[in-house]
Amino acid sequence: FWSPVHFPNQPATMGVLLDEKHPAFNNFPTDSYSNWQWWDLCINSKSIVVDAINAKPLVSVIDNFVTNHHLTNLFEAKVGEGQLIFSSIDLTTKLSERPVARQLLHSVLLYMNSENFVPSNNITIKNLNALKLEGKQSDFSAKDIYK
């Protein structure tokens, strides 16, 4: 049995869960749980604590029993008059060497440019600014949406 209590210097999450039929994954073959292709994505991501906001995770990161936070590394939301996909998965670095990240980015961008991209949950800019990334306050700006 693996536990952060017994192995405190290792990652404290227990895998991911997702709706593999969600249109964001139409061009990204996956199961509803972390499989081989999630290895690179998970080691190149940060889990975001979304306990206090109305985030709709596309990928739910399973927290351990000690902290039991609502975690994600990919979610969608309406913000004001707009809508967004928030990713704390690195989908920009060395994509020529990371085919899985490249394919997830491709699938998410196709989804965002489709009629299916209609997030049902509302969050505010204040909610985004309050997100915690690895226990530290994160800063977000308009520059974050550009490569």
What is each residue range found by the language model?
Residues 100-113:
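Short amphipathic C-terminal alpha-helix that caps PH/PH-like domains
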Residues 2-99, 117-122, 126-147:
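Catalytic beta-strand/loop cores that center a nucleophilic Ser/Cys/Thr
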